[in-house]
Regions:
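Sec-dependent signal peptide recognition
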Residues: 2-10
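Hydrophobic h-region of N-terminal signal peptides that target proteins for export
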Residues: 10-18
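Short S/T/G/P-rich N-terminal loop/turn motif that feeds into the first structured element of a domain
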Residues: 17-101, 112-130
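Non-heme di-metal
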Residues: 102-107
Length: 130
């Protein structure tokens, strides 16, 4: 009986640790502002993007706009980082985003303000959470 209890306890601990280590897709865009455009222009487009995202309903997509503070390789005016809870969610939400003209219109609006030369998808595994 003790062996069974130890096994169940170990399985619960393993399952808990395993679920905490799930990977999540995170995209990064490296962008430079177009001639004559500013971060204020970008934030105006971000406001429109947020409104569009709200019309799509529930979403697991979290987005971050990052500007350089210091470093040697500061080649972009800003980075856009966005993450989903899973690859399945990424696919479903990308389909929803481009499922009507709104997604293409948002891409065009971003393109008027900035040129994003780099787009990467990384898998992120939390190693410490607050």
């Amino acid at each position: 009986m003790r062996s069974i209890m130890r096994f169940v306890l170990a399985a619960c601990v393993f399952a808990s640790a395993n679920s905490k280590a799930d990977s999540h897709p995170v995209e990064f865009w490296g962008c430079n502002l177009n001639e004559g455009k500013s971060m204020s222009d970008m934030m105006a487009v971000v406001g429109r993007w947020n409104e569009y995202m709200d019309t799509l309903g529930d979403s697991t997509y979290d987005a971050y706009l990052m500007q350089p503070a210091y470093g040697d390789l500061l080649v972009y005016d800003f980075l856009w980082a966005g993450s989903w809870e899973s690859l399945t969610a990424m696919g479903a939400e990308t389909d929803k985003f481009y499922g009507n003209d709104g997604g293409a219109e948002m891409d065009a609006a971003f393109g008027e303000v900035a040129t994003c030369e780099v787009h990467h998808l990384w898998m992120s595994t939390p190693i410490r959470e607050s």
